[in-house]
Amino acid sequence: MWSNLLPVVQKGDRLVATTIAITSEVFKFSGQVHLDTYALDVERVSIDLDRYDDVAVNSLRLSLEAIRKRTTEFAFWQRTSKLGRPAYEERALLVAFLVQQLLGLTFRETEGILSLFRSYYGIDRVPDHSTLSRKLSSKRWTTVLERFFQHIVDELPKRSAIVATDATGYSGRKRGWRETKHAQRASEDWVKVHAAIEVDEFVVLSYSLTDSNVHDSREFSNVWDRLPSNVTPKRSLADSAYHGENCLAAARRHGAVPLHGIKKNARHFARPETNYQKMASFWRHWPNRAAALYAKRAHAETVFSMIGALLGHRLKCRSSNGRKNEVRVKLALFNLVQLAMRKEFWC
């Protein structure tokens, strides 16, 4: 295969570099290799520029329309009273929270921009900035935002999925989660998100919010117990933080085959008994096959990066509950934006 490469010419004691011509045949391979197991053919790589232009031009418009569509269909179950000052419509508040995250606005800027969108979203009264800040920190909106997230994922079709589980953090700090040293994360005021990601669709299926000092593995069962009923997990992907027997057993209970990271000193077991021994034996006996199946675990980190790029990793609220509710808005809006780019969402 390497016969097509031009050698380096040696003149006396000097090495003279020549042009190395690597043909495309070098990149055509199949079977199990160290890099990956996908066949790579650079001559067939193509980009649909027309579709890319359509998505780039209409992404914001489709996102705003998706907010209007889903908030109209969602049942708020808001209680009303004939006494006292009339309460703001909760649909208007939810629209405000979603638009604020989508456009990266402050509460005051959100109040101003909603005045332009009053007729588009059918809002009678625009909430002021102090109301938005106070409502987002309330326990009532914790329930509403969790129900709204569930409303979005419940609308997806029934399917089997490969689920990757990972954790990230959000705070008001300028330095992001990935830029923060691991030892500092547990002592700082981060909102830690433990999420289950559908790796093929880049959609957040379920999540759990904790303080930053909670270990990833402790929330694995809670996250998987919250998976929507229309998703049947067939494989569980996670890093070595989730190699414990409780995590593996939780994935098995939901019908998924766990393929998590293992310890560096793990060995092959001739007669494996526990879930971890079975998984470690698979890693040691078929390392290339395990690595190929495990490769999509990185999609969970890709989703976290997409959320940070689209909505930012910094939080505006100062109260503990308000910060968590702000993260709930980010996760629900990210799913909404992802689904709005698909034709099936509008059918």
For each feature predicted by the language model, list its residue ranges.
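Basic, amphipathic alpha-helical segments enriched in Lys/Arg and hydrophobic/aromatic residues
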Residues: 286-347
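Helix-boundary capping/turn motifs
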Residues: 69, 86-91, 106-109
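Charged, often Cys/His-bearing segments associated with DNA-binding zinc-finger transcription factors
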Residues: 1-81, 150, 341-347
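Helix-centered, glycine/charged polyanion-binding patches within enzymatic domains
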Residues: 35, 240-309
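Short, charged amphipathic recognition helices of the HTH superfamily
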Residues: 104-116
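Short, basic interhelical loop/turn and adjoining N-cap
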Residues: 116-131
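A generic secondary-structure signal for well-formed alpha-helical elements
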Residues: 121, 140-143, 311
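Polybasic low-complexity intrinsically disordered regions
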Residues: 7, 81-94, 99-102, 134-254, ...
